[in-house]
Amino acid sequence: DWERREGPDAIPDQIRFERRWGEVRRYANDRGIRILGDLPLYVAADGVDRHAHPAFFRTDAVAGVPPDYFSEDGQLWGNPLYDWKAHKAEGYAWWVERVKAAFRLYDILRVGHFRGFAGYWRLPAKAKTPETGRWVKGPGPDFFKTLLKAVANPIIAEDLGDITPDVTALRDQFKL
């Protein structure tokens, strides 16, 4: 239970933080400094997004990456994967709101694990190692056509990991 774990002061603390952050951001912006924020592709398995919007997440698979120059064995992250068909059916509204919320905090947004929008490493939910995964096509251009109609702020694509021509093409198509 969130309230019991975080305590009765957690919500006022969050409000105070948001107000103070707004002051810091305005101070920086007034001096020509833009704030760069980070938006990870995946959410936490035990996070509020997954619990508040279960239809947008798969329960049979989790995220990771295959062996690459960062890890010779690959990585089993364990984050829930998105049900991209469900997101598309809703016009990617959850994503649009997620990105808009990030832009209430930041001026520029770096999207982590960008390559997952072109293709991502899908592992069975009960996987013990990353070798059991496989590449699955991501939402690609359809997602960014919708997102960028709603959000005009600058987005930077993280380019770490196994960057294949389809990832580069997606990044370049939308000038990210």
Regions of interest found by a model, annotated:
Residues 1-20, 42-176:
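Alpha-amylase-like alpha-glycosidases and glucanotransferases acting on alpha-linked glucans and related
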Residues 17-42:
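Conserved, well-ordered alpha-helix/loop/beta-strand core segments that scaffold catalytic motifs
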